Design a protein with these regions (language model features):
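Outer membrane beta-barrel strand-and-loop segments of large Gram-negative receptors
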Residues: 19-35, 72-73, 77-85, 166, ...
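Transmembrane beta-barrel strands of outer-membrane/channel proteins
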Residues: 1-3, 45-51, 101-107, 139-143, ...
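Gram-negative outer-membrane beta-barrel transporters
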Residues: 92-93, 197-199, 220-310
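Outer-membrane beta-barrel channels and translocator barrels
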Residues: 37-41, 92-95, 130-134, 174, ...
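Structural signature of Gram-negative outer-membrane beta-barrels, strongest in the C-terminal barrel
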Residues: 40, 74-201, 256, 281, ...
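C-terminal beta-signal and adjacent terminal beta-strands/loops
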Residues: 301-325, 341-345, 352-423
Length: 423
């Protein structure tokens, strides 16, 4: 798999490059798995190995110690990963009580710590009990391990060292517990309630800005391409309620509400909201089957405000620093301390199906944001006035600039006409 991106100053291809990267990932996998269904218990076990080759070529300008400096490296890593697993399951009490127990082992050759699969030992247990034909209780608990990205493993510093290997990069681990119940009276109704708690350890934290990589998104470019330490923690917990009406007089209705928190520690061990910590999500969906192959459906969503960060005014008003990104810099000391307003949106869709002997034709009209709701977004900053001129700071016009705020709302209606053919 190949990834890449090039950015030019002022988006002018005749100008000098600000950043240029290209990465290639190649994998060869071998896996063995065996199932036994005739034993007193169901047994599944297996093992696998994976050879990976990762190559990354990076060039970018950086603002460091008040100066714009180029940064460039080439990396190539060969990695052997391995896995073994076993899972046993059975049913008791006239199949009302179901139990599943499993263990997973993973490792790779990047660091001494990651090469020992015992350190990534991952047991998990699943229980389910049917109190009656219409009431079930479920519970899951487990420990999981996930390797860091190739980008993070392949990062090299200015001296050409794989610093994250020297920093003792580790598998990201997670302890998860989920408890839920489901009540389904009759043929049409279904209600469920679920609570969850997820605790993360060894999450990579950036040594440059001191925040967890878990909170870095596409706004940050190639995520993980930096020096990190596997010292971050995280937690996500909440509850979800779902109610469904299915197949009643050709009507389907679903209502779900999720109340949750998602937080990761920074370099000082302080929990900060993750970038997707909207805290609550409400979804209402409905569909109705009309005569002659017509269907109409709708979905209404209400989402809590996402967190965002104020800008680093000192760095953002520096002309040299601005020339690299052409946008404001994040104030990582106050990371995700602000929050957008809540948002809501209605999507509607109309389908018409035509059935033929060996295939089906589906025509549809989909309208997103049907009532043109203004979706709040974090402020955008510009260094230009309304006439397009750079706003020099009168106190230091050669090196400093002024900024103004553009309030942006993504409140556009988006209609789509489509055709689907199924054989």
């Amino acid at each position: 798999m190949r990834n890449g991106g090039v950015k030019y100053r002022d988006n002018d291809k005749s100008a000098s490059k600000i950043s240029d990267y290209q990465s290639d990932e190649a994998e060869i996998k071998l896996r063995y798995e065996r199932n036994y269904t005739t034993l007193p218990i169901k047994l599944n076990f297996g093992a696998g190995i994976k050879y990976s080759n990762y190559v990354n070529d990076v060039y970018r300008l950086q603002f460091s110690s008040g100066n714009v400096v180029p940064f460039q490296y080439h990396s190539s890593i060969d990695l052997l990963s391995y896995q073994a697993f076993v899972q046993a399951s059975d049913q008791y009490l006239n199949n009302r009580f179901k139990v599943s127990l499993g263990v997973n082992l993973v490792g790779n050759t990047f660091t001494a710590s990651m090469s020992n699969p015992i350190k990534q030992l991952s047991p998990r247990l699943s229980l389910s009990y049917s109190f009656s034909d219409d009431f079930d209780l479920n519970a899951n608990i487990g420990h999981y391990a996930m390797p860091p990205s190739y980008t993070t493993m392949g990062y090299r510093n200015t001296e050409g060292n794989y610093v994250n290997r020297s920093n003792g990069l580790k598998y990201i681990t997670s302890n998860q517990a989920i408890v839920g119940m489901e009540y389904h009276p009759g043929n049409f109704l279904r209600f469920s309630l679920e609570g969850f708690y997820k605790q993360y350890s060894h999450y990579p934290i950036s040594l440059t800005d001191g925040i967890s990589l878990a909170s870095k998104g596409v706004d940050y470019g190639q995520v993980g391409d930096e020096a990190v330490m596997s010292t971050g923690d995280g937690r996500a917990y909440g509850v979800e309620v779902v109610a469904k009406l299915m197949g009643w007089r050709d009507i389907d209705l679903t209502a779900s509400y999720t109340l949750f928190r998602s937080e990761f520690t920074d370099k000082n061990g302080i929990y900060r909201p993750s970038s997707w910590d909207t805290r609550h999500i409400l979804n209402l969906t409905t569909s109705y089957k009309l005569p002659k192959g017509w269907y109409i459906s709708a979905r209404w969503r209400y989402i809590g405000g996402a967190p965002y960060s104020p800008i680093d005014v000192e760095r953002s008003t520096n002309k040299a620093a601005w020339s690299i990104t052409n946008q404001a810099y994040t104030d990582y000391e106050r990371f995700n301390t602000l929050r957008l307003a809540d948002a809501h949106q209605l999507d509607v869709r109309l389908d018409k199906e035509f059935y033929f002997k060996h295939w089906m034709l589906n025509l549809y009209l989909d309208v997103q944001n049907a009532y043109i709701s203004n979706m709040p977004s974090k402020p955008i900053y510009t260094n230009r006035d309304t006439e397009g001129r750079v706003m020099d700071d009168p106190t230091s016009p050669d090196t400093k600039q002024l900024l103004r705020t553009l309030v942006y709302y993504s409140g556009t209606i988006l209609p789509t006409v489509g055709i689907m053919i199924k054989f």
